[in-house]
């Protein structure tokens, strides 16, 4: 039996640990909070992040990083993007053999503009990692914890590693596909949080279904524009980690990013929203990173730019919506039309 370690005991890490134990694995969950580990080991629950879900006794918690990662065959990183470097640096000295690393977070590092797998390639020496795999898709932890049907994608530069992770997680409640396009998978997973924030804002403003449908559709267009420019496969954005993740994150009350946007739409200040949420809202940091990427790659991302104005420059949400609706007219399939015209020339 493989030793599987989960770095992070938030809602998603806990839900995935449950999937793994349903498949007959023992999982060691690491967290820095002793009270959280006590809940997992003694009460077999995680009231803080995944309430009302009974955890398997095969999930063992620890605050000791050496105990967690020593001799691990698979190490799953389930911490927010901003904590990944620090957690990996804590783990590396205690890793005793090459492991497959799986990350399940969705974000881009501001300033460096690195995807999470790129951060991991930098922080993990070649003598401790076999491969890096991303597990992503439309998957709320609350529903996974209740064993509702869920489908995700495992992506890696190594299809062997992606298939290994597919086999580790797949069961009758949790279906896993593979996809070699790690760039597209990571970009889709990260940037959908931006559109979810914007969708929450339109709902908070009471704008209704028409506005949300337009936002999701045009949001997908700018995600695909940037992702393709960065080297992703355009088809990936029509899959689970593109349109699939976008739909679930923009329409569900489980979505932290949607809930945060909803409060912004109702007039709350950003700092008050983040305090009210009490958990990481990845879309805020990702908006800053995506805005920087749009400039770097010279890609039009009007929704991202409008949200950036709201979050970081104090623009009113109503003004941001008005600016989007007042943009100059263009063709819906502008990129395709331009490509076709260039080919004709």
From Swiss-Prot:
Induction: Appears to be expressed at very low levels, which could be the way used by B.subtilis to regulate sn-glycerol 3-phosphate synthesis. Belongs to the NAD-dependent glycerol-3-phosphate dehydrogenase family. HAMAP family: NAD_Glyc3P_dehydrog (MF_00394). It catalyses: sn-glycerol 3-phosphate + NAD(+) = dihydroxyacetone phosphate + NADH + H(+); sn-glycerol 3-phosphate + NADP(+) = dihydroxyacetone phosphate + NADPH + H(+). It comes from Bacillus subtilis (strain 168). Does not seem to be inhibited by sn-glycerol 3-phosphate, in contrast to the E.coli homolog enzyme which is very sensitive to allosteric inhibition by G3P. The keyword Heme does not apply. The lineage of its organism: Bacteria, Bacillati, Bacillota, Bacilli, Bacillales. NCBIfam families: PRK00094.1-2, PRK00094.1-3, PRK00094.1-4. Its EC number is 1.1.1.94. NADPH binds at residues 11-12, 32-33, 106, 141, 256, 280, 282. Sn-glycerol 3-phosphate binds at residues 106, 137, 139, 192, 245, 255-257. Signal peptide: none annotated. Pathway: Membrane lipid metabolism; glycerophospholipid metabolism. This is Glycerol-3-phosphate dehydrogenase [NAD(P)+]. The active site is at 192 (proton acceptor).
């Amino acid at each position: 039996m493989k030793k599987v370690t989960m770095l992070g005991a938030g809602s998603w890490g806990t839900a995935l640990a449950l999937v793994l134990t349903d498949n007959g694995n023992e999982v060691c969950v690491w967290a820095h909070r002793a009270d959280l580990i006590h809940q997992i080991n003694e009460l077999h629950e995680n009231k803080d992040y995944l309430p009302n879900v009974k955890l398997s006794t095969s999930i063992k918690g620890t605050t000791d990083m050496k105990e967690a990662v020593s001799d691990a065959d698979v190490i799953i990183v389930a911490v927010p993007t901003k904590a990944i470097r620090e957690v990996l640096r804590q783990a590396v000295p205690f890793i005793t053999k090459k492991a497959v690393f799986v990350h399940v977070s969705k974000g881009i590092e501001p300033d460096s503009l690195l995807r999470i797998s790129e951060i991991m390639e930098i922080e993990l020496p070649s003598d401790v990692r076999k491969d890096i795999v991303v597990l992503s898709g439309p998957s709320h932890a609350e529903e996974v914890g209740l064993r509702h049907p869920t489908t995700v994608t495992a992506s890696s530069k190594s299809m062997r590693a992606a298939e290994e992770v597919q086999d580790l997680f797949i069961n009758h409640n949790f279906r896993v596909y593979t996809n070699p396009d790690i760039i597209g998978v990571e970009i889709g997973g990260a940037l959908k949080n931006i559109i979810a924030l914007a969708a929450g804002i339109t709902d908070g403003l009471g704008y209704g279904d028409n506005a949300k449908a337009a936002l999701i559709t045009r949001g997908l267009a700018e995600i695909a524009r940037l992702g393709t420019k960065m080297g992703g496969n355009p088809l990936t954005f029509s899959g689970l980690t593109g349109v699939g993740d976008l739909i679930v994150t923009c329409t569900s009350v489980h979505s932290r990013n949607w809930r945060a946007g909803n409060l912004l739409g109702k007039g709350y200040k950003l700092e008050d929203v983040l305090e009210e949420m009490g958990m990481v809202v990845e879309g805020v940091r990702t908006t800053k990173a995506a805005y920087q990427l749009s400039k770097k790659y010279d890609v039009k991302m009007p929704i991202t730019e409008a949200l950036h104005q709201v979050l970081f420059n104090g623009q009113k949400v109503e003004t941001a919506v008005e600016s989007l609706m007042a943009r100059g007219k263009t063709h819906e399939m502008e990129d395709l039309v331009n490509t076709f015209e260039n080919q004709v020339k």
